[in-house]
Amino acid sequence: MKNRNRMIVNCVTASLMYYWSLPALAEQSSSEIKIVRDEYGMPHIYANDTWHLFYGYGYVVAQDRLFQMEMARRSTQGTVAEVLGKDFVKFDKDIRRNYWPDAIRAQIAALSPEDMSILQGYADGMNAWIDKVNTNPETLLPKQFNTFGFTPKRWEPFDVAMIFVGTMANRFSDSTSEIDNLALLTALKDKYGVSQGMAVFNQLKWLVNPSAPTTIAVQESNYPLKFNQQNSQTAALLPRYDLPAPMLDRPAKGADGALLALTAGKNRETIAAQFAQGGANGLAGYPTTSNMWVIGKSKAQDAKAIMVNGPQFGWYAPAYTYGIGLHGAGYDVTGNTPFAYPGLVFGHNGVISWGSTAGFGDDVDIFAERLSAEKPGYYLHNGKWVKMLSREETITVKNGQAETFTVWRTVHGNILQTDQTTQTAYAKSRAWDGKEVASLLAWTHQMKAKNWQEWTQQAAKQALTINWYYADVNGNIGYVHTGAYPDRQSGHDPRLPVPGTGKWDWKGLLPFEMNPKVYNPQSGYIANWNNSPQKDYPASDLFAFLWGGADRVTEIDRLLEQKPRLTADQAWDVIRQTSRQDLNLRLFLPTLQAATSGLTQSDPRRQLVETLTRWDGINLLNDDGKTWQQPGSAILNVWLTSMLKRTVVAAVPMPFDKWYSASGYETTQDGPTGSLNISVGAKILYEAVQGDKSPIPQAVDLFAGKPQQEVVLAALEDTWETLSKRYGNNVSNWKTPAMALTFRANNFFGVPQAAAEETRHQAEYQNRGTENDMIVFSPTTSDRPVLAWDVVAPGQSGFIAPDGTVDKHYEDQLKMYENFGRKSLWLTKQDVEAHKESQEVLHVQR
């Protein structure tokens, strides 16, 4: 197999190269950029100023991931139809309706020269490699461009910023289901009456649950703002919502993750069916990512601090994240980052380390704008009819007619939905609006921080709802729930839209001092799996996302608390244990045991529960690579599905009942598209089976007047009938299908980022990070102040030559990932030199 890096060095820059000695590195000229790749193809960039450093970064990204990045750019800006045709017109329209390009450009124009050098240098580096590709496409043009029939376009700073805006801000900090919630509330009021309907809504979508596990322990602090969902004043002010719920209009995807391009009616049917089967974990679900544990000096063994991160973005080919080392201009860092952002989301600089998980704070509100019946395009605000902002957008369509449409915007934000029957337009207001580029650069600048104070200064500038984590060489650890959050009016129910007439406009933004944070917690560790950051902190408004007594973070807490101290290897092994852990066994086994305790030993329902009792909840593959060694998850899947049908689903009017029917286990033949979580229906059911122990008022009896035991046993009877017909009467012989894991060739938007044949599979689904990394400070087993590892599957590269030759680093981390392995991350010049596979030297004048 050809080594593309060696090919590049020999064919493109041989005249620029000379032997790299360490003294020469220190004395390199201001125009020089050195690119050194390690044995896994991960590049380290050396330059003396910011522009040259990020020029080198953009240059290597283009070498490795040019097609992936081209499709990410088109996906985030809504220009996919231009190269892939009419099936992507609706997708492009949806993308363009969701952002305001002039606002992003204005932020870029306001940057300091130093910060502008980051984006400009990166774009210039991308373009430099594209220019070389254009001079030698027979060798250097990635095959995917020929497969799909177009060529790469040049980059500008706007494109670099929009990759971040579209894949981080708009994916992980833009989720809202307030209009969906209003549709649900409308149906609940029709079924139960106004007062009781609101009470049932509170049972299904509570705002705060005091029993929810928190990343910051109660003894450390509680969230100071109190929310009373019984004091909602805005619900009564809203019009009915009888249109289809907006969640049904999200573009449907197939099992391969590709957009299906369906008619509106068929799309809604597909989304409803997919969500009913897979819930938030499935094809029609929402991101439910990621996990992290940080162990400080009082709990780490043979080290002062250990950080293990597992961001769960989903699995893709090429890899979702990109490994890079940056050295010079005040930077000295190593790690990896999604879509090759110019700021490392996961990494360290030899003194501190950092990582992230999605925060799921509520930083987005929907304002119901009252439209003028006489003046189209006008809405009522502060007693006056105000003209909306608008812009015309034209979608260029490959082999088709261009389509022009209008994007509308009010003082609150872009218009997402219009209900002509009530003369209402729904505008999305983001607390981070206007702070997108500053948020990106906060990630970039944190790479220079050397202590908690410097690091939190950047955390304060990061406006998206993202959890940030910290560790340092002295064994200090910390956590901040970053983001900008609205200071809402009293009586504003953040789960629902509010009138946009002016009275309910935000008072401003809450100060950063209000953000949940902790430094060196008493427990000696920090753990998160997208759970609540702090007691009394309000959850996201997403109907599919709840913080309650049932939470998967308990699986991490339990493992960390089992040992007084953990070594680095033990901390890494938590990945293996949690990735195979059934998430419902711990929650419902006591209920099942209580219900069957009076049954005879021969009763098959008791046999099912005894099988669960003997099981540790860990799913392991049989030798056939297709089935589980234990049938526990299959039993829980069928039982939970039956229980939900008899309880939560029965209590919710159609079509919203489909939101709560998924057990959380069902998936496609290719496996889940992302992280597995406890389903929203299961979380609601868990509160119900707790009875008086639950802090959530049970406005409607989910057991419909029957004893809880009777319903549990009936669901167990369903389970036995279903599984015994399928596998026979001997439970010990049941071999139930395992979940697979697929690295899909379509990005999370559903847009191709590779050819279909680049899809990669592994037999075992692992509920773990898309990448995993571990950083260990002051290890006693080494004379280095820090040791670091990661695994970025399938591999560093995404390059396939025009003749079909696959780069040697395309999938050389696939088996490593499957076996819970890891590779070293190098930082020092000596280590990079010792593990050098190839080298390239550029001389570039600015």
Curated annotation (Swiss-Prot):
InterPro entries: Ntn_hydrolases_N (IPR029055), Pen/GL7ACA/AHL_acylase (IPR014395), Penicillin_amidase_A-knob (IPR043147), Penicillin_amidase_dom1 (IPR023343), Penicillin_amidase_N_B-knob (IPR043146), PGA_C (IPR033813), S45 (IPR002692)
Co-factor binding details: Binds 1 Ca(2+) ion per dimer.
One GO term (biological process): antibiotic biosynthetic process
GO molecular function annotations of the record: metal ion binding; penicillin amidase activity
SUPFAM superfamilies, A to Z: N-terminal nucleophile aminohydrolases (Ntn hydrolases) (SSF56235)
Name this protein carries in UniProt: Penicillin G acylase
Keywords: Antibiotic resistance, Calcium, Hydrolase, Metal-binding, Periplasm, Signal, Zymogen
EC identifiers of the protein: 3.5.1.11
Subunit structure and binding partners: Heterodimer of an alpha subunit and a beta subunit processed from the same precursor.
Reaction(s) catalysed (UniProt annotation): a penicillin + H2O = 6-aminopenicillanate + a carboxylate
Top EC class, one word: hydrolase
Cofactor(s), names only, from the UniProt record: Ca(2+)
Lineage: Bacteria, Pseudomonadati, Pseudomonadota, Gammaproteobacteria, Enterobacterales
Annotated localization: Periplasm
Result after altering residue 290 to C: Loss of activity
PANTHER family: ACYL-HOMOSERINE LACTONE ACYLASE QUIP, PEPTIDASE S45 PENICILLIN AMIDASE
Top-level lineage group: Bacteria
Propeptide: 236-289
Signal sequence segment: 1-26
Keyword NAD: no
Example of a GO cellular component annotation carried by this entry: periplasmic space
Amino-acid positions noted as binding Ca(2+) in the UniProt annotation, renumbered to this chain: 178, 362, 364-365, 494, 541
Organism of derivation: Escherichia coli
Family the UniProt entry places it in: Belongs to the peptidase S45 family.
Active-site residue list: 290
